[in-house]
From Swiss-Prot:
Bias-annotated ranges (Acidic residues): 312-322, 340-356
Top-level taxon of the source organism: Eukaryota
Basic residues bias: start-end ranges: 383-395
SMART domains on file: ZnF_C2H2, ZnF_U1
Bias type Basic and acidic residues, positions: 323-339
Complex formation: Associates with nascent pre-60S particles that have not yet entered the translating pool, and is released from mature 60S subunits.
GO molecular function ontology, one term from the record: nucleic acid binding
Keywords: Cytoplasm, Metal-binding, Repeat, Ribosome biogenesis, Zinc, Zinc-finger
Chain segments carrying region Disordered: 101-151, 163-204, 312-361, 382-401
GO CC, any one term: preribosome, large subunit precursor
Protein name listed in UniProt: Cytoplasmic 60S subunit biogenesis factor REI1 homolog
Organism: Chaetomium thermophilum (strain DSM 1495 / CBS 144.50 / IMI 039719) (Thermochaetoides thermophila)
A biological-process GO annotation: ribosomal large subunit biogenesis
Zn-finger (C2H2-type) residues: 18-42, 83-107, 260-284
Length: 537
């Protein structure tokens, strides 16, 4: 009887039991598999697998590494490019820009001009002499130092050792290859032999004929000052006391040309052109003369002795000040008080009030004191023709206009109205709220004159026989009736006919009043009512 084990075929042991499903390769032992897991090829295939891309073989990966090395070397060569055009004195750090410059018309014209110029008469321009280079380009035939080779090898190793979790790029920008130590020492020796001659600026001489704003040259200092005053608007303070105009102009010249400082605000710039542009843009053309320091700065060019009192400037203090080089601009002098006889009055040192200082009038009576040399103005008011009571003629006409017999002067009757010669009255603005009222039924001067005439006629008719005017106020037209006979009399209103006539008259009166009111309202809408302030009250 055959057993099961005997019937089975012997199992074959695989030669490469360890595999990598990502790269689709197999290995004989685990050591090779673990080494493959740490290689750049496997890491690159892992990245492609994450991106859903198929894996690549080791040959394709090697080609990609060589291409990356070539690109890195080209970038390093491009970054280290530096060439200088000797004709144009310009340095270029890009090969394309250098080629474009060589093919430009400007470079060719300068090269042709340099070829025609004799070699012994070549003189550098000011601009070319001031140009400098940041570094000398590396020579093609120089021996490259071993440190540069090590740096490039480190870059290549970094590509191999790159991992997925690395955040920074393993490629590091290499520096330009440095020449060997022997070549560097030769270059240093040549630079030491070349003498460095820096031109020293010549000492500037102050000029009183040069304009500090536009560099205009004038024949004389006086014409220079006139030019700056008329053209630029410069103001010289205290010109009547100026004794040294030339010294003042030189002082301003040194301040601008030597110290590059603004005359007005004191701001400093890098050169003369910058400070002149600043003064022109800001209109800083005047010389400051407000504070004591500013006055002392230019005080040596002035002479104020003519403003001193006699003998004041001949004291010892002035002599001492002149020896020390100081300048006196004048001191405060005490005021002298002289009485009527011309004698000097000594003032009280402590400042107490005297009898002459205090007023001899009461404070309450000060408003009634007339002006000195004039009598009270109210006494002359009655003598004025406009307010005279001796003139019997009417003050105004019937229409309210001033009578021609009166002089036409604008006068005040009170504090709120001004009566003009034309007859109109101008009200005070404090009463404007009342003047703005639209009074439709305000009577005109003609209507008021008519009413006054009617009232005067009625008053004359009611006068008594003796000529006495009846009592003003509410008139009592009803007769006094005793209480015992009240109601016995018969009035006219008890008659129906009389009552009808009276009611009809009242209706007509109301009708006329309504129609008149409607007409007045229509007129008031079409044309503005006259201002009440124009009427004479």
């Amino acid at each position: 009887m055959a057993t099961i084990a005997g019937s089975r075929a012997p199992t074959e042991v695989p030669s490469h039991p360890y595999t990598c499903n990502t790269c689709q390769v197999a290995f004989r032992n685990s050591e090779l598999q673990r080494g493959h897991m740490r290689s750049d090829w496997h890491r690159y295939n892992l990245k492609r697998r994450v991106a859903s891309l198929p894996p690549i073989s080791s040959e394709v990966f090697t080609e990609k590494v060589l291409q990356a090395r070539a690109a890195t070397t080209a970038q390093a060569d491009k970054a280290g490019f530096e060439k200088t055009c000797e004709v144009c004195q310009k340095t270029y750090y890009s090969e394309n820009s250098f080629r474009n410059h060589l093919s430009s018309t400007k470079h060719k014209s300068k090269a042709a001009a340099a070829a025609r110029r004799p070699a012994n008469n070549k003189v550098d321009d000011d601009v070319s002499s001031m140009s400098f280079s940041l570094g000398e380009p590396a020579r093609a035939d120089s021996v490259v130092d071993s440190e540069a080779e090590e740096e490039f090898s480190e870059v290549v190793e970094g590509i191999k050792n790159a991992s997925i979790h690395d955040t920074a790029s393993p490629i590091k920008r290499p520096s330009a290859p440095q020449p060997a130590v022997e070549e560097q020492s030769k270059t240093d020796a040549q630079m030491e032999e070349t003498p460095t001659t820096t031109p020293k600026p010549e000492a500037l001489t102050p000029s009183a004929t040069t304009c500090v704003f536009c560099n205009y040259e004038s024949p004389t200092p006086q014409l220079n000052a006139s030019h700056m005053e008329r053209i630029h608007g410069m103001f010289i303070p205290e010109k009547q006391y100026l004794v040294d105009l030339e010294g003042l102009l030189k002082h301003l010249w040194e301040k601008v040309f030597r110290y590059n400082e603004c005359l007005t605000c004191g701001k400093m710039k890098v050169n003369v052109f910058a400070i002149q542009t600043h003064m022109r843009d800001k209109s800083h053309y005047h010389i400051p003369y407000t504070t004591e320091e500013e006055q002392l700065e230019i005080g040596e060019f002035y002479d104020f002795r003519s403003t001193y009192s006699d003998g004041d400037w001949e004291t010892e203090e002035e002599d001492k000040g002149e020896e020390d080089g100081g300048v006196r601009l004048g001191a405060k002098r005490e005021s002298k008080v002289v009485d009527e006889n011309g004698d000097e009055v000594m003032e009280d040192e402590e400042g107490w009030e005297t009898d002459s200082d205090a007023s001899s009038l009461d404070t309450d009576d000060l408003h009634a004191v007339p002006a000195e040399g004039h009598y009270h103005q109210y006494e002359r008011l009655g003598k004025h023709p406009h307010h005279s009571r001796e003139n019997k003629k009417a003050h105004r006409e019937a229409d309210g206009i001033h009578a021609p017999s009166k002089r036409t002067h604008a006068v005040y009757y009170d504090e709120y109205e001004l009566h003009l010669p034309s007859g109109k009255s101008v009200g005070h603005r404090s009463l404007a709220r009342y003047y703005r009222q639209n009074l439709y039924h305000y009577p005109t001067p003609e209507e008021r004159a008519e009413r006054l005439a009617i009232e005067a006629a009625e008053r004359e008719n009611r006068m008594d026989v003796d000529g006495e005017e009846p009592e003003r106020g509410r008139t009592r037209t009803r007769a006094l009736v005793p209480r015992d006979i009240k109601g016995l009399g018969v009035t006219t209103m008890s008659d129906p006919r009389v009552r009808g006539i009276v009611q009809k008259g009242k209706k007509e009166e109301w009708k006329n009043r309504d129609s008149k009111w409607w007409m007045h309202s229509q007129v008031a809408i079409k044309e503005k009512a006259k201002h009440p302030s124009t009427y004479l009250r």
